[in-house]
Amino acid sequence: MRYGYTKQIALPFADAVQKTKEALAKEGFGILTEIDVKATLKKKLNANGDNYVILGACNPALSYRALQAEKEIGLLLPCNVIVYEDRGSVFVSAILPTVAMHVVDNGRIAAIGQEAESKLRKAVDSVSNE
């Protein structure tokens, strides 16, 4: 089962991260967290790896509606978006909220998940068209 929406990006890694943040902002998402996985693994384990950033993206309006419908939905928030390098290519991938929220038996959550997924797909597509 696919759980992410991924596109290869024809940009340098740092530019892809910046463009991804901008594209998410256009769709109403703010970045709550930004984790530089490569730097963290180097610091904690002295391990080398490819560039890899996890962005914790939150759309306040959608999150508010989700929390009104299901208090424990915070266990599945925020929506993670990753930008990473693999064998010299750069990729952007967003979680598919419809898949992640499938575990919640609540029709209102399903509808919010569909709306969030549409916005995330638009953001990823926007970066891939740069």
What are these regions (language model features)?
Residues A16, Y64, M101-V103:
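Intrinsically disordered, low-complexity acidic/polar segments
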Residues G30, D36-I82:
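Compact, glycine-rich, soluble single-domain proteins
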